[in-house]
Amino acid sequence: MNLINIIENSQKKSNITKLFSGDIVKINIWVLEGNKKRIQIFEGIIIAIKNKGISSSITVRKISNGEGVERMFPLHSPIIESIIVNRHSLVRKSKLYYLRNKKGRSSRIKQRLKK
């Protein structure tokens, strides 16, 4: 087997939930402040997913104090404690970059109902 594949497989997390564009997620992240370590929660909508093996990442957008905040998270990073899916949304595109230009109620996305 290829040496790179062996190293990548040892670094991959196996407990990652299935994520889709448009999902509202809550990501718990380990943050270092001085010599203390705590968990910070980042909650928002997934606007992009890049699946590239161990370097897979998601882009999450939230509105904080009226300003849009986007953050990219590598899925297999050790700073991510957990990813919790709060809600699935009904979208027809894989990249939701058009949400950057929307404000208020126009930026809302319909919820996907389970059958």
Curated annotation (Swiss-Prot):
SUPFAM superfamilies: Translation proteins SH3-like domain. Keywords: Ribonucleoprotein, Ribosomal protein. One of its GO terms (cellular component) is ribosome. One of its GO terms (biological process) is translation. InterPro entries: Ribosomal_bL19, Ribosomal_bL19_CS, Ribosomal_bL19_sf, Translation_prot_SH3-like_sf. One of its GO terms (molecular function) is structural constituent of ribosome. It comes from the Bacteria. PROSITE patterns: RIBOSOMAL_L19 (PS01015). NCBIfam families: rplS_bact. Belongs to the bacterial ribosomal protein bL19 family. This protein is located at the 30S-50S ribosomal subunit interface and may play a role in the structure and function of the aminoacyl-tRNA binding site. This is Large ribosomal subunit protein bL19. The gene is rplS.
